[in-house]
A protein has these predicted regions:
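Short, acidic, metal-binding catalytic loop of nucleotide-sugar glycosyltransferases
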Residues: 25-34
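Catalytic core of nucleotide-sugar-dependent glycosyltransferases
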Residues: 141, 192, 196-199, 205-232, ...
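Short beta-strand/loop segment that forms part of the nucleotide-sugar
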Residues: 34-44, 61-64
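Conserved nucleotide-sugar donor-binding catalytic segment
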Residues: 133-209
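Glycine-rich, basic loop-to-helix element that forms the pyrophosphate-binding segment
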Residues: 63-79
Length: 287
């Protein structure tokens, strides 16, 4: 049996308890591996949830710093196996997911990334990591995020905690994907090994705050040593994120905030895309 660690970050609240146990079950059901489950708890942790979880074959670590990135980084520092994975507390590993990933590790591979199934409202869509991603992962990332929480397996001595600590809120796995494509050897396996529940109630990506996190997160991506053509594509996404934040603030009745975001979009290289919005916003932006 091959040892592997799976990190499950969670706030361990009663609202997440059922899906958290579902995630744990999906790891314990893995064949041909010996999984160690590290549950990294932080935030509004519920003592009852933790007590019931402690009755299962998991190791619970408490992170004093709030936030997803901090919880994962804290747990990565405790990994003592050659390989580790991360799994969000509302997602599931598919059967034989870990064995399939381990089978693809050659000595020169730092990360194995697989396809995954995205589930929204009971409708499943396979997110592929086929030839387009394999041929140019940086460009592919500007079109669709090919790395999801839970779709990768990492070599511990190559991918350390600082990668996860640096992940910006709202764009964690996209940012990590860029970093991996820039600096590490990735093996892509175009076989789904993860069921990603994109519509779990309370998920941060479904909250309006997620929109307002995008500009800062994309700004962090822009600080990476991206090739010129990729840099231009990310700059375009950055400008679009500023505009989206402006629109959302306006719809919420926050005219001054809408103007602040809009003015920032006009300071980008793609200002001309949003200039006409100025005349529309002007008579409607009084708080």
């Amino acid at each position: 049996m091959r040892p592997v660690t799976v990190i499950i970050p969670t706030t361990a609240t009663p609202a997440r308890e059922a899906v958290l146990h579902r995630a744990v079950n999906s790891v314990l059901a893995q064949r041909e591996v010996e999984p160690t489950i590290l549950v990294a708890a932080n935030g509004a942790v519920d003592a009852g949830v933790i007590h019931r979880l402690a009755c299962r074959p998991v190791r619970i670590v408490c992170c004093p710093v709030p936030g997803l990135s901090a919880a994962i980084a804290h747990a990565v520092g405790m990994v003592d196996t050659e390989f580790f994975a991360e799994l969000d507390d509302d997602d599931e590993l598919l059967p034989d997911a870990l064995a399939l990933r381990l089978d693809r590790f050659a000595p020169d591979v730092d990360v194995v990334v697989t396809a995954f199934i995205r589930s929204v409202g009971g409708v499943h869509e396979v997110i592929r990591v086929g030839p387009a991603v394999q041929g140019d992962p940086l460009r592919a990332m500007t079109q669709e995020a090919w790395l999801a929480a839970g779709s990768g397996l990492y070599r511990t001595n190559a991918i350390d905690a600082h990668y996860f600590r640096a992940m910006p809120a709202g764009l964690e796995w996209t940012y990590l994907g860029y970093c991996l494509a820039l600096h590490h050897s990735i093996h892509f396996l175009d076989v789904p090994t993860l069921l990603y529940h994109a519509d779990t109630p309370g998920s941060l990506s479904k909250l309006p705050a997620h929109v307002f996190q995008q500009p800062a997160a994309l700004g962090q991506v822009l600080a990476l040593p991206l090739p010129g053509p990729i840099l231009r594509l990310v700059r375009r996404k950055y400008a679009a994120a500023l505009h989206q934040a402006s629109e959302l603030e306006y719809k919420a009745g926050h005219g001054r905030a809408a103007w602040d975001w809009h003015l920032r979009s006009l300071m980008t290289r793609y200002w001309w895309r949003y200039f006409a919005y100025t005349r529309w916003l002007l008579p409607r932006s009084v708080d």
